[in-house]
Amino acid sequence: MPYPRRVIIYLREKGIPSSLVTIVRVSDPNNGDAAPPEYPPRPAGSLPILAIPPAAHSGSQTYIYIRQSNAIMTYLDELCDEGRDGFPLSKHLMRGTDPLSRARDIELLALADECTTAWNPVRTFGTGAGTLSLPAAAKEMIRWVYRALATIESWWADRDFSSLRRGANGQVSMAEVVLYQFLDFTKDCYGVDITQGSGQTVKDVYGREVVERYTKVREFYEAFRTRDSARRDAAAGEVPPEAALKLMTTWAEGVL
């Protein structure tokens, strides 16, 4: 699931220990969609959900829930930036250090989220994991993913990503976590390296001629994937089961 994974990557990048934020693995929706008995019942809503215990908020008698991945990361990030409630003080700021850098991070975050949202109809109409086979619709929607990637590509024309590689001590932003999660999701779960454009000149969704090539986005992806935070822990349920992978990687003819 893409949205819980971005939070997992964020927690690793931030160095937030499991003693402060415990990841609770729920059962498959077809098998109860429930949390283990030692934890509170799974609240309603799509995952991830951050359950804040009553003790963390004076006057509250019940759990407080945050039900959106970006909101969860922002909440935790502010706790770390302020060193509140026992959270480790941020070693670097993941949402920018001044008004301009914060605006840039929001720009990238919006496009990364747009990619993830646009992918839903691509996989729904174009793969065996979907509920309705409409290859033409899936093919059209993937062009909107390319539109967002093309914009990001233009922003990064002069950027060097070597510092993001494991051991190079480079830091990532929250928006970069979200973008990497999308690129990782399409590659590892759907077998599509979305950064590999055709290299051909095509018309985008607005009828403009563009070169379908995302060299800098690919450089970013290759650098980030070497980081410890990007690993997938099969024992923790971060790798889809074989049956699900088979459906996700079964593409209708003509989509790709």
Residue ranges and their predicted role:
Residues 1-11, 176-177, 188, 227:
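Short, thiol/selenol-centered motifs that function as redox-active sites or metal-ligating centers
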Residues 2-139:
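GST-like domain detector, emphasizing the conserved glutathione-binding G-site
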Residues 8, 194-198, 236:
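Structured alpha-helical bundle/scaffold domains in large eukaryotic membrane-trafficking regulators
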Residues 25, 231-243:
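Acidic carboxylate-rich catalytic motifs and surrounding loops in phosphoryl-/glycosyl-chemistry enzymes
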Residues 82-85, 232, 245-256:
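Eukaryotic N-terminal low-complexity, Ser/Thr- and Lys/Arg-rich leader segments
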Residues 85-96, 163-166, 232-236:
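Short, hydrophobic secondary-structure boundary micro-motifs
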Residues 97-105, 240-254:
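Amphipathic alpha-helical surface "interface" segments used
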Residues 100, 104-226:
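GST-like fold's C-terminal all-alpha helical module
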